[in-house]
């Protein structure tokens, strides 16, 4: 959504284990025969700056959660600076809705991480200040998160479970009051947040962030809430 057209991941042990664990041993067997052609040469890994136009190294232990938006996914703000940024730009601080799912950030792992935040809130008797909804990424995801009690965790907090579809990400959301076109803020884990996309309201300030952050912001009901 911010300009990349292609991304590649070299074949390695992690990919091999994943393919085997998901019933694709035949793919593993075929890939193992040409494994050296499915990843970069050793010289590239040793000196990547010699082979690429730009090398970006990210230390995950130092990475701060970001909230992107509104109206574009390439405007990122660290959570520690969101309060000042929102005040400077007149963005509505109150979060009306938190949405997780669609095709992006709706895997079993995504849902389970968000549910861990929800469980902590429920255990402490905290109720969400914003409306909260999830779209499972597929029927398999819906089935497994229901089987493992994750949907029940969400429902204990009053979360609305939508169908396994694109949902609000492509405007399949009959949001009550959207026709009034009032200025408001929503946060979601969808990868697109362009004007009018979710609910048809050009004044809806949609922000993109991780499933965990969506859960935290929906519970707090504030865009400037910093959970870290």
Region spans (language model):
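Fe-S-dependent hydro-lyases/dehydratases of central metabolism
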Residues: 1-228
């Amino acid at each position: 959504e911010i300009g990349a057209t292609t991304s590649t991941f070299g074949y390695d042990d992690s990919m091999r284990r994943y393919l085997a664990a998901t019933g694709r041993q035949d793919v593993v067997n075929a890939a193992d025969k040409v494994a050296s052609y499915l990843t970069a040469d050793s010289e590239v890994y040793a000196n990547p700056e010699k082979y690429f136009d730009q090398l970006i190294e990210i230390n995950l232990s130092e990475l701060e959660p970001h909230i992107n938006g509104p109206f574009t996914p390439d405007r990122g703000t660290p959570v520690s600076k969101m309060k000042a940024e929102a005040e400077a730009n007149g963005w509505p601080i109150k979060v009306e809705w938190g949405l997780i799912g669609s095709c992006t950030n709706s895997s079993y792992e995504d849902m389970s991480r968000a549910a861990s935040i929800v469980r902590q809130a429920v255990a402490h008797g905290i109720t969400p200040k914003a409306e909260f909804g999830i779209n499972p990424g597929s029927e398999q995801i819906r089935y497994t998160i229901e089987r493992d009690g994750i949907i029940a965790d969400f429902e204990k907090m009053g979360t609305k479970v939508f169908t396994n579809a694109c949902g609000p990400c492509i405007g399949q959301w009959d949001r009550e009051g959207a026709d009034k076109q009032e200025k408001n803020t929503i946060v979601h884990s969808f990868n697109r947040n362009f004007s009018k996309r979710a609910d048809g309201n050009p004044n809806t300030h949609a922000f993109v962030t991780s499933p965990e952050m969506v859960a935290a912001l929906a519970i707090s009901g504030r865009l400037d809430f910093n959970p870290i």
